[in-house]
């Protein structure tokens, strides 16, 4: 038995034990396709039948069984040794017509387009330019400005900020709002995130080495307040939520999304209310490569959802297979796993994360999505990456 196989076998035992102890669901794996179209899949009700559908690459798949597919844009298959033109996918009604549309986050630095739902008609969906350059490898989707609509958190033209759309002007490009001075925010910038760090009700933005505080009255063109802190060397998505239940939002992130390490940063405040963080290790950034402890390289996508129904959000992540091809990064051909890390709050032991494996032959891309697809109130898992498109339905 090879060392990787031995590690994988040990991991399977741990995963089974984790499911039993944490109340995490078992999953049915649906292999939608083994072709590489994208590295980020998402969800939405595209035909208004009340059932959640899935979009991955050039197709959307009808729920609840996801067997019937519809081509909404031209099909192009990619080789897994390279990259696709679709790094992440997000959905919303971009033109206010009541139908769910699709936005494709492109290869970093390229122009981003959204595709207008054709309302059940045959043929490709109309294509609209959203943003001339979508920079960064982990753009996020969340309401930054408080208007009730999701914004695209990304870099653009050397700035970090967010792009907004106006459904009343669906044919117009999106507006990018910088929150930083112009700097080294390149097309390959690692680490984007959002959330209310200081508890003032305003959404702040995060990067690998800092968080940016949104002013009470943000003015266009004025940078937000920067607070330096080393969350990661090269993060993917930075998740912001209250991990330990103390009322303060913490940060969960990969340490190096092309290497190893998963950590959470506990928010702490001094007697004057100044904010700092204390790092806690979930998976070590420098694991023993000869040991049997769980290690996952290329944690290039993270999501948060309550998978076991205990009211505490858990972390969903996994390996991005061949992030830099078959010879790049650490252990590029190790099992492409998907994991939940179940959060347990214990007054005596503090916070612990129990790993529960969803699958060992799919992995994540630059995105992984969690959504209740089958109506059982348990988050299901959606993946589009170099191995194909996969849906994991709780059962």
Give residue ranges: language-model regions:
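Beta-propeller-forming repeat regions
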Residues: 18-395
């Amino acid at each position: 038995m090879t060392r990787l196989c031995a590690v994988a076998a040990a991991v399977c035992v741990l995963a089974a034990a984790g499911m039993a102890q944490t109340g995490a669901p078992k999953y049915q794996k649906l292999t939608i396709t083994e072709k590489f179209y994208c590295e980020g899949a998402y969800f939405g009700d595209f035909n208004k039948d009340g059932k959640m559908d899935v979009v991955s690459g050039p197709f959307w798949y009808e729920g609840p069984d996801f067997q019937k597919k519809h081509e909404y844009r031209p099909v192009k298959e990619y080789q897994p040794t390279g990259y696709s033109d679709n790094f992440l996918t997000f959905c919303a009604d971009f033109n206010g017509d009541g139908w769910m549309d699709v936005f494709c986050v492109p290869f970093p630095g390229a122009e981003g387009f959204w595709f207008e739902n054709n309302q059940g008609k045959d043929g490709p969906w109309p294509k609209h330019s959203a943003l001339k350059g979508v920079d960064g490898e982990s753009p996020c989707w969340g309401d930054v400005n408080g208007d009730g609509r999701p914004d695209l958190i990304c870099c653009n033209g050397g700035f970090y900020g967010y792009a907004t759309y106006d459904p009343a002007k669906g044919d117009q490009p999106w507006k990018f709002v910088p929150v930083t001075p112009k700097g080294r925010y390149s097309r390959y910038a690692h680490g984007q995130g959002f959330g209310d760090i200081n508890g003032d009700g305003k959404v702040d933005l995060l990067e690998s080495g800092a968080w940016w505080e949104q002013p009470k009255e943000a003015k266009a063109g004025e940078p937000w307040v920067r607070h330096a802190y080393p969350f990661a060397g090269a993060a993917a998505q930075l998740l912001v939520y209250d991990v330990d239940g103390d009322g303060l939002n913490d940060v969960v992130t990969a340490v190096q999304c092309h290497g190893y390490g998963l950590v959470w940063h506990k928010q702490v405040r001094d007697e004057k209310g100044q904010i700092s963080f204390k790092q806690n290790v979930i998976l070590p950034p420098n694991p023993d490569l000869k040991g049997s402890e769980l290690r996952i390289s290329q944690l290039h996508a993270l999501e948060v959802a309550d998978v076991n129904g205990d009211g505490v959000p858990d972390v969903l992540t996994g390996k991005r297979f061949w992030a830099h091809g078959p010879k790049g990064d650490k252990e590029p051909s190790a099992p492409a796993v998907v994991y939940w890390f179940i959060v347990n709050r214990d007054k005596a032991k503090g916070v612990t994360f129990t790993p529960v494996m969803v699958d060992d032959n799919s992995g994540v891309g630059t995105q992984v999505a969690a959504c209740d697809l089958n109506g059982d109130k348990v988050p299901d898992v959606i993946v589009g990456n170099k191995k194909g498109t996969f849906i994991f339905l709780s059962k």
